[in-house]
Amino acid sequence: MSRQTLYLDAAARPSAPKTFSFSGLQARSVEIVLRQAGQQPVDIGGTCNGRLAIRAPGRSMTVAAAAPFHLSLPVAETSVSLFPDQALTRCDLRVGSALAPAGAPLTLLREETADPWITALDSRYDRCPVPDPAGMEELNRVFYASRWLSQTCALPLGSPTLLRKSRDGFNAKVEALLGKRLPDSAFDKADPGLPLDFSHAPKLRLIYLSSLEFKADFSGRVMERLIRHHAALGTKVRILVTDVLEREKDDAMLHRLASEFPNVELQEYRWQADHGAPFDEQISQLHKTHHVKMLATLAEEPGRSRVIIGGRNIHDGFLFHRPVDLTRYPDLEQYGKTDGFSLNYYSNWSDFDMEIADPATVETLAAHLSTIWLRDADTNLSRPFSIPVRSRAAPRGVARHFISVPYEDGHALEAYFVELIDSAEHRIEIVNPYLNLTPDIARAFDGALARRVKIDVVGRIDLKGDIGGRFLTALNKLFVEKYGDRINIREFKAPDVVLHSKIMMIDERLVAISSVNLNNRSFFHDSENGMVVLDPAFYARMKPIYQDYVAHSRPVATNVTIGWAYRLLFSDAWVREAF
């Protein structure tokens, strides 16, 4: 089942012609959800060149090809579903309201026939040359091996830009869309309505933005304005965020954008348990999240495509030390709480991203993300992206991108990380703030220590300021209690900053940069992505980054104090698996 959402708001450019593309690629059926995003009733009528089934609360009907139909979307009725027949490729509709009684054209087009380029990207399926594992070093074998985890083939990496500083991380996204960076004064003033000069902006065919959060704050508004510019020029935009973390103003900003420009397609991810599912699965509906981080811009001009991956979300906490004053902008979020379980929380996070400009790699990562975008809507299953093919020649690429959906791929990411840790011979260097290891990852740590592999961890044991910070701190202390006398654990101690980077380096030649936390959530609950690089030269570039984290940290005392209530709570495996 392919499911896409068309957001309708009578106040969103009410007289402008609009086009919405839907995809039935490799799907047995298609559902187009018409979602009311405004405060005015909407009337829709027209014809399609194929049979169309319509389902609304309390009623349903089927319309023959070329037969006119009419439906209304009241304010109180949040959605109506359209089910186009496989032969249907086009609908010519008019959308009217009290604001535009004459109506405005709305065209629905099937992507497979209307846009061969995006269809080719979305249907890409790569053959990966895999060298004979006989005689290979174990780390190399693990890197090139095929597994159930969704991975690209080994790719060229070029010379990626390493984005350690927060402004550099945000400006990389800005430059990919605007063609130039924002000056320091723009961040100092923190005005989300600042003038933006689009004279150097690239001409883009596709924008992918995948993030845990897309907040209505300075960062989110600037990104929304950049995307809006390209949407007005006809660029196809695909945005993926987590529904359970979006607040009212976040939703309003994104829904308004998608309503004004239907070429901006929005997926708000929410995992739903089966009817009658056990209690723990019902509860996990509240905290399973889409944690894949990527901005990919595919440009028409050579050399201007970019992809950025890592740990940062679209949230001011990744850019500013403290909340900026947005009271002049009532439609933006003014943050308040700095601890607990409130969605109004604010932390200042130290994170790490990587920007890649190699055009083949950018396109490959965008195509890989399409497997998530076009996942089966009912099961969350995604099609494979690559297939291994035995090769005598050594692959030229040094980097592989992965995407994990642990509750659908049999915890394949956990198995991959276990393999990587098991292959370590000398040293493992880790930067990660969340240290609630799964049992299998813990056994891999124990095995590495038994082999006398040196493990160094730069973490953030005290996670006060993060959402649920007190619980996360207790879990980190349990890690220190277990491993403090065997692992060199250091606490990142930049003042009032919460570590958020996720880096793992093995034997001075393999580097993983990802969204993956070393906790149960990442391996059991959340979708994740990252890049694994097997290249000593790239490790040499990353080593100063790691040393900078070490320089901003101090050794952790092993005599931690953990309250009895937390010990009792986390003695239950089900509770630990939730964090």
Language-model regions, residue ranges each:
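Long, C-terminal catalytic modules of enzymes
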Residues: 495-579
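Short, solvent-exposed loop/linker segments at beta-strand-coil boundaries, enriched for Pro/Gly
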Residues: 48-54, 58-60
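HKD-type phospholipase D/PLD-like phosphodiesterase module
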Residues: 112-206, 213-422, 431, 458-509, ...
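A short beta-strand micro-motif common to beta-rich folds, especially ectodomain repeats
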Residues: 80, 89-97
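Short, hydrophobic beta-strand segments
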Residues: 72-86
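Acidic, glycine-rich loop-and-beta core segments that form the ion-binding/anion-interacting portion
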Residues: 414-427, 442-450
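Extracellular ectodomain segments of secreted/surface proteins
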Residues: 2-46, 50, 69-71
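Edge beta-strands of extracellular beta-sandwich domains
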Residues: 100-111
